[in-house]
């Protein structure tokens, strides 16, 4: 059986790649991360866009031999320089490390990423519906790049799945 990778893994890989290209100015064609299960995920980067203060790129979701509705969708990450927010709180286990590094990573959802609408979910009402494990993965990968580039400022990561709006209409939770 051929393994696929989660949407969260795709988001983390795209985030790492966009952060790398932003902080180093170098282009990447592929990127690899290690998933929480210890599996190396190497993937090709698509639709790379550079702006003055941000870089975005996409990773194509591959569901392997057990595909779901998101298989084939492009998962985008845009990483940009931002000001530190006094109200921002990542809610991850990496908070202590983040403070020690003096780097701040803010994670939000863009087009095609739902918002939490009811209490009791993994994230507070109003937040992007990106659960804590993918958030931890994204933060860890971006922090790794920050350490490598000796960057101690603030970065904002926006995860988008343009096809997500269309895909959500085919599920039990179209919001």
Regions found by a protein language model. Name each.
Residues 1-175:
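Generic N-terminal targeting/processing segments that precede catalytic cores or assembly contacts
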């Amino acid at each position: 059986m051929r393994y696929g990778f989660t949407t969260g893994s795709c988001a983390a890989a795209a985030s790492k790649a966009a952060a790398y290209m932003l902080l180093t100015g170098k282009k990447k064609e592929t990127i690899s991360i290690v998933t929480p299960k210890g599996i190396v995920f190497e993937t090709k980067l698509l639709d790379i866009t550079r702006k003055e203060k941000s870089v975005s790129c996409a990773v194509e979701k591959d569901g392997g031999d057990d595909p779901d509705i998101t298989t084939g969708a492009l998962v985008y990450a845009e990483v940009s320089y931002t000001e530190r927010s006094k109200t921002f709180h990542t809610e991850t286990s990496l908070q202590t490390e983040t403070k020690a590094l003096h780097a701040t990573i803010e994670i939000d959802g863009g087009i095609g990423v739902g918002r939490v609408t009811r209490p009791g979910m993994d994230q507070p009402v109003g937040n992007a519906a990106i659960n804590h494990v993918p958030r931890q993965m994204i933060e860890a990968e971006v922090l790794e790049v920050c350490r490598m580039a000796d960057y101690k400022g603030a970065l904002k990561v926006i995860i988008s799945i343009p096809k997500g709006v269309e895909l959500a209409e085919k599920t039990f939770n179209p919001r």
